[in-house]
Every structure is written in C-alpha cells, then in structure tokens.
C-alpha cells in the first residue's frame, strides 16, 4: 500500500479531480444538512438532546470534510479521491472520467478489486 501512496495522480486525473472537488463538497454538505434535518425532526428528543446530537454530528463530519477536501495536492489526491468514492460523492459517470489506472488504485485502496483487477 505504501508504494501506491507514493505515486502521484496523473496530471489528467488531477485536473478532473480539481473540477469535481466543488461538486463533491456540495453533495457532502447536502448529506450533512439532511442528517441534521433528521435529527431535528425527531419529536421524541428534547431540544437539548437534538442540539447535542447535531453538535456531535457536525464535529465528526467536519473532520471528514477536512480529510477529504482540505489542502488538495497531487501527493494526497489518491487518498482524497478514495475518500470521495467511499462516501458516494461521485456519480458513476464522474468516476469513469478518471483513467483506468487511477480507478484500479482507488479500488485497491478501498478493497473493492474484482478478479482481473477491474
């Protein structure tokens, strides 16, 4: 795995990733806001409990946002792309824009390789 992480993303894939960062961040924030709405809609909980649940959720999700989106660089791009893919932040068409080599690395990182490496 270390040898994979030492590789930088291809220039063409880096350009695609930079294009998709804003879209993926918007999707992630939409997911988080949806989770907040679900917590708020729970009439069985007190307002204070809802507040505490939302606070914890935002803290946890903020760490995830930082891991996936903060300080994008070519040296961390493969990990960030793997995180985006694992969070379901890219559509199938968006993901297929990346080279087969990059998709193979992401599949390896996520443990989703199939027979034949595809």
Question: What positions do the PLM features span?
Answer:
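Acidic, Ser/Pro/Thr-rich low-complexity regulatory regions
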Residues: 2-118
């Amino acid at each position: 795995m270390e040898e994979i992480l030492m590789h930088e993303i291809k220039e063409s894939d880096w350009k695609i990733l930079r294009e998709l960062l804003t879209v993926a961040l918007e999707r992630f924030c939409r997911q988080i806001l949806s989770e907040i709405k679900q917590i708020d809609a729970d009439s069985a909980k007190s307002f204070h409990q809802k507040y505490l649940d939302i606070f914890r959720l935002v803290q946890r999700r903020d760490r995830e946002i930082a891991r996936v989106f903060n300080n994008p660089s070519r040296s961390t791009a493969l990990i960030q792309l793997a995180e985006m893919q694992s969070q379901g932040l890219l559509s199938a068409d968006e993901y297929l824009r990346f080279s087969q080599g990059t998709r193979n690395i992401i599949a390896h990182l996520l443990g989703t390789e199939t027979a034949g490496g595809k």
